[in-house]
Amino acid sequence: MFLLDANVLLAAHRGDHPNHRTVRPWFDRLLAADDPFTVPNLVWASFLRLATNRRIFEIPSPRAEAFAFVEAVTAQPHHLPTNPGPRHLMLLRKLCDEADASGDLIPDAVLAAIAVGHHCAVVSLDRDFARFASVRHIRPPL
């Protein structure tokens, strides 16, 4: 199963994102397929924070448009909701130790721990996931 990161969702959603032209076709194929994928709620929160932020986008996504994207993706029959499981803190500690993670790498470690807990591969444009040796990281074709 794939766990999608906020940067992949932003690239798929925003036509002005530098990676939109390559990520969107990959994303459309994911939605058209039957393979399960997940987006944890904390990733959706990050997506909404970034997509609607005037400091990031000259013309941010209207909140209603950003929520419509969230609702369209989560309505897919092969989208499976996931959130931190009962072993999350133990996995987070292990991954932080493995990658010597602190500061800005902690949110990536949180996603990595969710991915490990649910046997997912992380799909992200962020190369920092390569620092977690026990996490399978996939970059969409660019």
Curated annotation (Swiss-Prot):
GO terms for molecular function: magnesium ion binding; RNA nuclease activity. Its EC number is 3.1.-.-. Mg(2+) binds at D5, D108. Keywords: Hydrolase, Magnesium, Metal-binding, Nuclease, Toxin-antitoxin system. SUPFAM superfamilies: PIN domain-like. Residues 3-139 form the PINc domain. Induction: Induced in persister cells in response to D-cycloserine. InterPro entries: Mtu_PIN (IPR006226), PIN-like_dom_sf (IPR029060), PIN_dom (IPR002716), VapC_family (IPR022907). One of its GO terms (biological process) is negative regulation of growth. Its cofactor is Mg(2+). Belongs to the PINc/VapC protein family. Toxic component of a type II toxin-antitoxin (TA) system. An RNase. Upon expression in M.smegmatis inhibits colony formation. Its toxic effect is neutralized by coexpression with cognate antitoxin VapB31. HAMAP family: VapC_Nob1. This is Ribonuclease VapC31. It comes from Mycobacterium tuberculosis (strain ATCC 25618 / H37Rv). The gene is vapC31.
